[in-house]
UniProtKB/Swiss-Prot annotation:
Keywords: Cleavage on pair of basic residues, Disulfide bond, Nematocyst, Secreted, Signal. Belongs to the sea anemone BBH family. This is U-actitoxin-Avd13b. Disulfide bonds join 33-45, 36-52, 67-79, 70-86, 101-113, 104-120, 135-147, 138-154. One of its GO terms (cellular component) is nematocyst. Residues 19-26, 59-60, 93-94, 127-128 form a propeptide. It is found in: Secreted; Nematocyst. It comes from Anemonia viridis (Snakelocks anemone). Residues 1-18 form the signal peptide. Inhibits ion channels.
Length: 159
């Protein structure tokens, strides 16, 4: 009886060890990819089989687009913000936030959002991966890198 118990225990231990997989930390907001996807060097969301269980799981049907909520995949495969899919005309335009930067970012003289290490704990914390764009909700980054208010993405009414 003891030998059967020991064999059973050993088999359970081996299965438990085999079940442990290499877990990667989830993506920070950049890239805006869904779970199990990572952003490649060209900015596209690609399936990461190792981050999703490796050889233990079958690769699921590809989610097209593999972008987070409020993002859609453009023709080149990049995830871009979809202002209509995220509120459209359903919300009133809120008061303008100045500066329109996320927490730990400040607006510099040219209007760009830059990381403020002192406002976020100074030398006690490492500078996080840059959030691209580092703009608050209802703001988008224009071609020059400035955060500008996006009334359509925040529910502005059609005129």
């Amino acid at each position: 009886m003891k030998s059967i118990f020991l064999v059973f225990f050993a088999v359970c231990l081996v299965k438990a060890e085999a079940g442990k997989g290499r877990k990667r930390e989830p993506n920070i907001i950049n890239p805006p990819c869904r779970e199990c996807y990572v952003q490649d060097s060209s900015g596209n969301c690609v399936y990461d089989k190792w981050g999703c269980g490796g050889a233990r799981k079958r690769e699921p049907n590809i989610i097209n687009p593999p972008c987070r909520e409020c993002y859609v995949q453009d023709s080149s495969g990049n995830c871009v913000y979809d202002k209509w899919g995220c509120g459209g005309a359903r919300k009133r335009e809120p008061n303008i936030i100045n500066p329109p930067c996320r927490e730990c970012y400040v607006q510099d003289s040219s209007g760009n959002c830059v990381y403020d290490k002192w406002g976020c704990g100074g030398a006690r914390k490492r500078e996080p991966n840059i959030i691209n764009p580092p703009c608050r909700e209802c703001y988008v980054q224009d071609s020059s890198g400035n955060c500008v208010y996006d009334k359509w993405g925040c529910g502005g009414a059609r005129k």
